[in-house]
């Protein structure tokens, strides 16, 4: 891993979804664990959702992406309802890759449409915008806030992280 080679902290542990996810989560005890699973692996996604306290859905600002989110929620709806009956799980959505021009309507329209979708409990007002810093930092194996701590991308990420993890990111 690039982070390890460059001795950048924190050293992030990455586990394969081929392993049993539930066992991996139990081994981490009370710490925060982020599981990133693509919709192409529906079995792993359902397993991750069943173990999750929160499901975070990033949605690009377009009608097609709102429809895709609606379709996804419909596909996993029964599984999510069963999980919610057993706990306090939340499904949270936010607009990702929003246009940097605040007058572009699609971002606002997407946020409004997400609020109407059944299955989404919270729509965050915090957004990540389409910024070159995100793309460039990813190719370096770093987060935008690590490469350019004072950048707009870093500030947007900090704001989103604080909304999601106020006890960790907000301190």
Report each predicted region and the residues it spans.
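Conserved C-terminal guanine-recognition region of P-loop GTPase G domains, centered on the G4
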Residues: 69-88
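Inter-motif core of Ras-like GTPase G domains
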Residues: 42-63
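Histidine-centered active-site loop/cap adjacent to the catalytic His
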Residues: 149-170
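C-terminal boundary of histidine-terminating zinc-finger modules
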Residues: 136-155
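Structural beta-sheet core signal
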Residues: 35, 57, 93-95
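Beta-strand-loop-alpha "switch" segments that mediate conformational coupling across diverse proteins
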Residues: 99-102, 111-142
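P-loop/Walker-type NTP enzyme "switch/lid" segment
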Residues: 1-43, 138-139, 144
């Amino acid at each position: 891993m690039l982070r390890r080679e460059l001795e950048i902290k924190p050293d992030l542990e990455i586990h394969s979804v081929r392993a049993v996810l539930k066992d991996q989560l139990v081994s981490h005890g009370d710490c925060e664990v982020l599981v990133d699973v693509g919709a192409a692996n529906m079995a792993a996604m359902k397993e991750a959702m069943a173990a999750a306290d929160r499901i975070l859905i990033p949605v690009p600002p377009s009608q097609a992406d709102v429809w895709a989110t609606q379709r996804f929620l419909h596909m996993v709806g029964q599984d999510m309802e069963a999980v919610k009956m057993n706990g306090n799980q939340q499904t949270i959505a936010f607009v990702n890759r929003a246009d940097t021009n605040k007058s572009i309507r699609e971002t606002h329209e997407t946020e409004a449409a997400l609020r109407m979708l059944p299955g989404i409990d919270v729509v965050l007002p915090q957004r990540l915008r389409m910024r070159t810093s995100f793309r460039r930092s990813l190719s370096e194996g770093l987060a935008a806030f690590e490469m350019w701590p004072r950048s707009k991308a870093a500030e947007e990420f900090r704001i989103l992280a604080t909304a999601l993890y106020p006890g960790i990111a907000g301190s």
